[in-house]
């Protein structure tokens, strides 16, 4: 059970407000995509506030048959004692784009912790294609957050999964850089036959170690992570196009590596601000879409 993770041992006390996981603090979202003759549709939608999805929209000019879904929260952020669960299921030959309405703010905490049980369970059938590109995560002072993502993917399917972690509210008051208590993220992928592909887990506890040391964040403030699960032929071609960058003048660094078991690619980027980090992720996202689907990525919205 995610709440029993070792890094949460010191955060088991109950909030003085609503109890952990009670009504309004136990969100659930299930998205099921199916193929219709003319396009992919959002055929299954189960939601429990504060997570909300209204409907799929088809605004992507590069892929007009691609359902685009924005996940909305009416809670103003993730609070102590919250328990969120998200399930995304793609049937064979489907395509989908899932994002969030805005940045995910993990509010300041004085008791317990919050989980986004991104036990996110993501399942991709044969020849399916999913872009999961949420907005950044902003952990506030003393926040504690754990997320776990379990992916089951067919060998012919493709997943583009990204996350961007901010250092905190950088421009709030005198600044909050790495003032959160805990951020833990685990990602595990397996094929549909049960074969495990890889697991990545990182735990950040700024009070227990210098996050700004060499080998961690260094002098950077924003961390971006893109996981591309795709057939080896696509991964090989994309890997040859990605050159590592380390440019302190521009405040950006990135690089790519191959995932174990020919699962795909891992792309990591560090920056001083969120915009350059997201732009670097978008560049890889665009190249991956072009490689896998042959479609282009439309220009970014001015407000994105």
From Swiss-Prot:
> What family is it from?
Belongs to the UreD family.
Name where it mostly resides.
cytoplasm
Concerning InterPro entries, the annotation shows: UreD
Under which name does UniProt file this protein? Answer: Urease accessory protein UreD 2
Q: What does this protein do?
A: Required for maturation of urease via the functional incorporation of the urease nickel metallocenter. Disrupting the ure2 operon has no effect on urease activity or pathogen survival in BALB/c mice when administered orally.
The subcellular location is: Cytoplasm
Which gene holds the coding sequence for this protein? ureD2
For this protein's source organism, the top of the classification is: Bacteria, Pseudomonadati, Pseudomonadota, Alphaproteobacteria, Hyphomicrobiales
- Alphabetized UniProt keyword annotations: Chaperone, Cytoplasm, Nickel insertion
Classification via PANTHER family: UREASE ACCESSORY PROTEIN D
According to the UniProt record, one GO cellular component term is: cytoplasm
């Amino acid at each position: 059970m995610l709440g029993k993770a070792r890094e949460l041992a010191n955060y088991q006390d109950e909030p003085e407000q609503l109890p952990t996981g009670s009504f309004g603090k136990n969100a659930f979202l299930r998205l099921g995509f199916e193929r219709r003759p003319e396009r992919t549709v959002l055929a299954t939608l189960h939601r429990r506030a504060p997570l909300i999805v209204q409907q799929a929209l088809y605004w992507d000019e590069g892929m007009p048959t691609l359902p685009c879904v924005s996940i909305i929260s009416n809670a103003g952020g993730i609070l102590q004692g919250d328990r969120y669960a998200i399930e995304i299921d793609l049937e064979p030959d489907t395509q989908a784009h899932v994002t969030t309405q805005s940045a995910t703010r993990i509010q300041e905490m004085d008791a317990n912790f919050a989980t986004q049980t991104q036990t996110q369970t993501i399942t991709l059938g044969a020849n399916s294609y999913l872009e999961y590109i949420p907005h950044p995560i902003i952990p506030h002072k003393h926040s504690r957050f754990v997320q776990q993502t379990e992916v089951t993917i067919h060998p012919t399917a493709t997943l583009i999964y990204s996350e961007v972690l901010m250092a905190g509210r950088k421009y709030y008051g005198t600044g909050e850089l790495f003032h959160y208590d805990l951020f833990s993220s685990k990602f595990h992928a397996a094929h549909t036959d049960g074969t495990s592909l890889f697991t990545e887990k990182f735990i950040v506890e700024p009070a227990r170690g210098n996050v700004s040391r060499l080998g961690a964040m260094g002098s950077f403030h924003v961390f971006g992570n893109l996981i591309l699960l795709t057939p080896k032929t696509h991964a090989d071609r994309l890997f040859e196009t990605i050159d590592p960058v380390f440019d302190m003048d521009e405040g950006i660094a990135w690089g790519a590596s191959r995932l174990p078991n020919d699962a795909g690619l891992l792309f990591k980027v560090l920056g001083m601000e969120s915009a350059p980090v997201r732009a670097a992720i978008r560049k890889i996202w665009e190249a991956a879409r072009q490689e896998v689907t042959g479609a282009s990525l439309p220009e970014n919205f001015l407000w994105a």
